[in-house]
A protein has these predicted regions:
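Extracellular distal adhesion/interaction modules in secreted or cell-surface proteins
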Residues: 4-170, 177-179, 189
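Extracellular carbohydrate recognition
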Residues: 182-192
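Structured loops at beta-to-helix junctions and adjacent beta-edge loops in soluble globular domains
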Residues: 175-177, 196
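Short beta-strand-to-coil "C-cap" segments at the C-terminal boundary of structured domains/repeats
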Residues: 194-200
Length: 200
């Protein structure tokens, strides 16, 4: 978390890795080391189509979670970038999570009257990434000043494309529309969540 005024900037180091592990390294599965509470926000939903006049349509997107040893997925949020709760980046769900039980994240979008293929942190290749404060963004997330960087990410990155979040936060990036890294649409920002852990 950064506290700012006109003349100073303090960046608090991440301590969340004292409480969770991310597996595999660079992957998207979060494993609590102890029982924790997590508050989850949708920072943004970036699946879009473009109309013939150049205007953008935001597409319904569903974010899901699997936790505490469950074999089934639970919906975190189902909606669009333009929804008020997403725009305000408010808490969408709060869960109590159990030590040593993996937390996985996934998502899909609804287009042409059908749901897309479900992508998750258990998928291969990896299409979901979990990062903490100070980590370098996934390599296909556009640079901080690039026009293709989603506006909703601006407050969570610094100018060197490192993650800038609170010391007990984990940010989740999802690529839902492409699997080939050279595709122009592969930008790792189709669904972005902020998971804030606490002990009570």
């Amino acid at each position: 978390m950064c506290i700012r005024d006109r003349t100073w900037n303090i960046n608090y180091p991440s301590v969340v890795k004292n409480y969770i592990n991310i597996t595999p390294p660079g992957g998207g599965t979060v494993v609590p080391i102890q029982n924790l509470i997590c508050d989850i926000r949708v920072l943004g939903l970036g699946v879009t189509t473009q109309n013939s006049n150049g205007s953008i349509n935001y597409i319904e997107t569903k974010a899901q979670i699997k936790y505490n040893g469950s074999a089934s997925w639970t919906t975190l949020y189902d909606g669009k970038e333009t929804d008020t709760l997403v725009q305000q980046q408010g808490i969408v769900k709060t869960y109590t999570v159990t030590a040593n039980k993996p937390i996985d994240f996934g998502g899909q979008y609804y287009y042409n009257n059908a749901w897309s293929t479900f992508r998750s942190s258990t998928s291969s290749p990896t299409l979901v990434w979990a990062l903490v404060n100070g980590d370098t963004c996934p390599n296909r997330v556009p640079d901080y000043n690039a026009p293709s960087l989603e506006t909703f990410l601006k407050n969570y990155l610094d100018s060197s494309n490192k993650v800038r979040i609170g010391p007990m936060d984990v940010i989740i990036f999802m690529e839902l529309t492409h699997t080939v890294t050279t595709d122009v649409g592969y930008d790792q920002q189709d669904c972005v969540l902020l998971v804030s852990f606490r002990t009570s």
